[in-house]
Amino acid sequence: MNHYNRTIGSMLILVYSMLAAFLFIDKVFVNIIYFQGMFYTQIFGIPVFLFLNLIIILLCIIVGSVLAYKINQQNDWIKTQIERSMEGETVGINDQNIEIYSETLDLYHTLVPLNQELHKLRLKTQNLTNENYNINDVKVKKIIEDERQRLARELHDSVSQQLFAASMMLSAIKETKLEPPLDQQIPILEKMVQDSQLEMRALLLHLRPLGLKDKSLGEGIKDLVIDLQKKVPMKVVHEIQDFKVPKGIEDHLFRITQEAISNTLRHSNGTKVTVELFNKDDYLLLRIQDNGKGFNVDEKLEQSYGLKNMRERALEIGATFHIVSLPDSGTRIEVKAPLNKEDSYDD
């Protein structure tokens, strides 16, 4: 309303000022007879002088209202641009449905650099947030990794050694002549200790995984299989094609292999696990398969941390992750990762 009042008032002052100046300058036009005629002559029963004033006021109101409406449009548009700028949007005049006056454009052109500076500040804030997150993420991962290493050392130095000692003692006892029912219970105890040792090795593999370091993916998997062949009663075989794999996905695939073998050792109750790695020209295929008891995939996929971790690692490198498992028919895990031939030769 302030714009309307100011505009109409200004127009009234302007019109009456011009009329007064005109009457003052034109001495001939201003005379007693004229004023008498203005007061005594009527239009629609209204004196001409009063009628003309009403017409002037009405015209000022109409014209002033139109001008005030236009000014309000300009101000509302500028206000909208400022609000958009504060909300992080890019200001512009391409989406406006009103005529923009030159004065408004001058104000808008002053606003554009401010909007650009706000955008830069937001980007800097995001970068700082990301940097802080990355720093904190690295610290957290380092803390977790150190704690996993510590737990692995303690388990290896205490529980693993005790299980080994118990296994040796049971083997020695078996060599002696035992009376029933001890002769039947000792093999059961020995089997329990062996299962515990297998579980412990799988747990240590999970807590303290081997790294590729300077090895290729194929070399790392071969070394892992050879190491397991010496330590676990399960038969571990491999069929590995050694080829160049982009460094960005090698570590993820190796961790998936470790996780899959660890789960097999702990839960499958099988006698054999096979690890395969093939180059299929435009993609690689990693397959881990066992002949264990199998499981219900739909139930385990959401409950098992290991399976979810493998799937997430596969998705991070743009690979597909499939599990096929049937009761008493074993489990097969397949990961297919795309290969970029140009990138595969970049170290």
From Swiss-Prot:
Q: How is it modified after translation?
A: Autophosphorylated on His-156.
Where mainly found? membrane
Membrane topology per record = Multi-pass membrane protein
Top enzyme class = transferase
**Got a GO cellular component term for this one?**
plasma membrane
Q: Name one GO molecular function term.
A: protein dimerization activity
Q: Taxonomically, which superkingdom?
A: Bacteria
Alphabetized Pfam families for the sequence = HATPase_c, HisKA_3
Q: Which SUPFAM superfamilies match?
A: ATPase domain of HSP90 chaperone/DNA topoisomerase II/histidine kinase (SSF55874)
Kindly give the SMART domains that the UniProt entry links to this protein: HATPase_c (SM00387)
EC code(s) of this entry: 2.7.13.3
TM region positions: 13-33, 43-63
Q: Where in or outside the cell is it found?
A: Cell membrane
Q: Which reaction does it catalyse?
A: ATP + protein L-histidine = ADP + protein N-phospho-L-histidine
Which residues does this entry mark as bearing Phosphohistidine?
H156
> Keywords in UniProt for this one?
ATP-binding, Cell membrane, Kinase, Membrane, Nucleotide-binding, Phosphoprotein, Transferase, Transmembrane, Transmembrane helix, Two-component regulatory system
The record places domain Histidine kinase at 150-341
Protein purpose: Member of the two-component regulatory system PprA/PprB involved in biofilm formation by controlling the expression of many related genes including type IVb pili major subunit flp pilin, adhesin bapA or cupE fimbriae. Also modulates quorum-sensing signal production acting on both negative and positive modulators. Functions as a heme sensor histidine kinase which is autophosphorylated at a histidine residue and transfers its phosphate group to PprB.
Name assigned to this protein: Sensor protein VraS
